[in-house]
Amino acid sequence: MSAERSLAPDLAAGSRTDELLGAGTRWLEASSDSPRLDAELLLAHALDKPRTWLYQTLSAVVPTETAARYAALLGQRAAHRPLAQITGMREFWSLGLQVTVDTLVPRPETELLVELALRRIPADMQMAVADLGTGTGAIAI
């Protein structure tokens, strides 16, 4: 069964932002460790708005086409597709990096590794960094 069909009662024409967030959160509870956050990020992506916009417009009616797109995004996430691959973007040290199915998604542990390396390397030391692999180039950046 598709996400669109399963969420149809909650995604009826004229659904508000808060209703869509609630439906999305419920849909992802069985497949995500952070269903509310995932629902928020996916709805913001479907709307092409920042996540903070959602809370400023909880009672706003979401266009039917956008709600359908959101349902499709929820279906991808429920199928365990990484959020960064769905949205095509992942933050790394506050930089927005493009992500595709061909790249490894930067992980929080990698940020910690970079922080540890920067603490141990003298600030005046000249060096070159090679970021090898199939990632986004986040470490070298």
Where are these regions (language model features)?
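Residue-level signal for short amphipathic helical patches enriched in basic/charged
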Residues: 34, 49, 65, 124, ...
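Generic hydrophobic secondary-structure packing signal
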Residues: 20, 35, 102, 106, ...
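Conserved SAM/SAH cofactor-binding pocket of Class I
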Residues: 109-141
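Conserved AdoMet
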Residues: 2, 41-119
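A general structural signal for well-ordered alpha-helical segments in protein cores
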Residues: 21, 39-40, 70, 83, ...
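A general structural signal for alpha-helical elements within enzymatic catalytic domains
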Residues: 28-29, 75, 122
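Non-catalytic accessory regions of SAM-dependent methyltransferases
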Residues: 1-53, 59-62
